[in-house]
Amino acid sequence: MKTLLLKKDEVRRLIGMAEVIGAVEEAYKAFSSDQVEQPDYIGIHHPSLRGEIDFKLGYYKANEIISMKAHSGGFTNNPAEHGVPNSIGTILLFDARSCALICIMDGSLITGLRTGASGAVSVKALARKNARTVASIGTGNQARMQIRAVNEIMKIEKIHAWSRTPESLSRYKTDIQREFGIPVIVASSKKEAVEQADILITTTRGKGSLVEADWVKPGTHIVAIGTDQRGKQELDPEIFRNAKVVVDSVAQCTEKGETWHPLNKNIITKDDIHGEIGEVLLGRKPGRESDDEITIFDSTGMAIQDNTTASKIYQNAIANNVGTFFQFFE
């Protein structure tokens, strides 16, 4: 047999955001239906001027594919010193029936795509139906990807954006308005942005509370993306006290996600977690039950999202004769 190699530009051509949203919905449902084996992911954090690298491994029983992803970020000196991007991703796909390596693909786009899609899936399930205004705390690549995904499933009338980096905020405003035609209002403070939100999206590498509880108005849906390791934090734990908390994985979010902080401070218990997003999508747990509810989606990211997304890309590549096959096994 031969192994397929897919480069970044090929991956980009092989899947669109609508397909990714479908793949992520499939992933969440599979995870909550005992169709997934997914060990705890591990990360290595380097000293200053370097970043972190995470490894995620997952087996999806329905498609008989095992995926393994390595994804790094925050290596700010990479372009100048090493001639490579500051964020690098690689995904390996194995046929679970033989454990033969069937595909090696660039994974740098997939992490951004499936993470953006996760926010959109939560908006479909948990945001108010009349939600129109988004607040973005953070204006980097993932903040853009969240808008790209949410824009697929609802009409965004305006975005209130805040960043601690003025240059990033300015680029975000220009890029979003040019690509989507959505007005972006530059907020003078985090508080100003949050108070306007029907949907609040946080995508920072924050190490402390960025969003205070009394800024969040009734009916807000919060998409908490940035916290996926101990030490990271974006939300005031008090927000969780009176919110409906939905997570991608109870096991991950209670140990490494935003939900760990209110648990650690005894503001909530594990019993206060409403459920996993897959349970909501399957109809086992209700989604939003009133227009006044504050809902939180805590997303730490799961290997099964990479699995279903990468598998779809692989299928599209085979169907369209894209990529390069090579003889990996003698």
UniProtKB/Swiss-Prot annotation:
Its EC number is 1.-.-.-. The keyword Cytoplasm does not apply. SUPFAM superfamilies: NAD(P)-binding Rossmann-fold domains. The keyword Transport does not apply. One of its GO terms (cellular component) is cytoplasm. It holds the Pfam family OCD_Mu_crystall. It is an enzyme of class 1 (oxidoreductase). GO terms for molecular function: oxidoreductase activity. Keywords: NAD, Oxidoreductase, Plasmid. It comes from the Bacteria. Belongs to the ornithine cyclodeaminase/mu-crystallin family. This is Putative dehydrogenase RA1029. It comes from Rhizobium meliloti (strain 1021). The lineage of its organism: Bacteria, Pseudomonadati, Pseudomonadota, Alphaproteobacteria, Hyphomicrobiales.
